[in-house]
């Protein structure tokens, strides 16, 4: 059975726990959208694993994990994540972690563009993580992006980055930020690309073969429905489709390959401090503590406020998720 796991709110609903539970009976785990601006925390025994780009199935032996074409991938960040997992005793090989050669790449100048654009918005800032996700997706949409396959060809990568930097540096200078040099960008990612090279492949035939063979595939959604670029609380959204359609376009598998969609929803939703259902009363906090213990993530980091689930909002998101 092939299953999509999506968040019905703003992310942080606990999808990682559900994916980890389903992975026990799965053969393949796929990440199809987003970047390292999202993360899943999985606790196995006494060990805590924090995943940003690597699918949760990496914690299980004999599971195949795929970073799909819909992901925007920071090669430096991914290598750091892999090294951290390896330090924790997780085995990562080209056999159990595949990276789509069509996945677009987040480069150092994307992060600076992200910061510049956020600063320029002033009071209309949207709270971006400044990890370059939006600019990378923007480059993809305007056909100025670079894919993993491009960067594995050194000469082509140098030419493409040089051309892209003309526009990027123009924007950065306009915002009073330092420009980037092609050689410096290449040098900064060269080591990471060498580390990732064995993992990069055309993942679409692999996924179609798994589907035809009747293997069980779990699609690990990132963020949540309210952050969907089309159906979320625009403009306070991410830059990709976080609903179930994003799993298909981000992996290369058609909708008919999907058997079920599981939506994960928190009773005390994250990101609710300014929502109509937010609560600031001591009695509410007492109830929360009785239900789920000391609230860390459900509360707004700035205001320390949680809220009741907004069912009238969650239900439409469930139907789209």
Regions found by a protein language model. Give the residues of each.
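Non-transmembrane, aqueous-exposed alpha-helical and coiled segments at domain scale
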Residues: 1-321
């Amino acid at each position: 059975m092939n299953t999509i796991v999506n968040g019905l709110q703003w992310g942080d609903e606990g999808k990682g726990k559900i994916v980890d539970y389903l992975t026990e009976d799965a053969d393949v785990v796929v990440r199809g959208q987003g970047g390292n601006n999202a993360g899943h925390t999985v606790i196995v025994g006494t060990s805590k694993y924090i995943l940003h780009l690597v699918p949760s199935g990496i914690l299980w032996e004999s599971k195949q994990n795929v970073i799909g074409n819909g992901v925007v991938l920071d090669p430096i960040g991914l290598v750091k994540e892999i090294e951290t997992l390896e330090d924790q005793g997780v085995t990562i090989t080209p056999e159990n972690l595949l990276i789509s050669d069509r996945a677009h790449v987040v480069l150092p100048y994307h992060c600076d563009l992200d910061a510049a654009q956020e600063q320029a918005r002033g009071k209309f800032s949207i709270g971006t993580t400044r990890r370059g996700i939006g600019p990378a997706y923007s480059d993809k949409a305007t056909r100025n992006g670079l894919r993993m396959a491009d960067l594995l060809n050194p000469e082509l990568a140098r030419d493409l980055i040089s051309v892209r930097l003309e526009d990027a540096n123009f924007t950065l200078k306009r915002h009073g930020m330092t420009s980037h040099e092609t050689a410096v960008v290449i040098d900064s990612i060269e080591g990471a690309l060498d580390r990732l090279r064995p993992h990069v492949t055309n993942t679409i035939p692999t996924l179609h073969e798994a589907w035809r063979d009747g293997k069980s595939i779990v699609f690990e959604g990132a963020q949540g429905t309210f952050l969907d670029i089309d159906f979320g609380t625009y403009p306070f959204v991410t830059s990709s489709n976080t609903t179930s359609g994003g799993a298909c376009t981000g992996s290369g598998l058609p909708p008919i390959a999907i058997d079920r969609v599981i939506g994960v929803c928190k009773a005390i939703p994250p990101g609710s401090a300014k929502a109509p259902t937010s609560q600031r009363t001591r009695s509410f906090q007492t109830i929360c503590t009785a239900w789920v213990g000391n609230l860390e993530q459900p509360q707004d980091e700035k205001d320390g406020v949680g809220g009741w689930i907004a069912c009238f909002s969650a239900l439409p998101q469930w139907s789209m998720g």
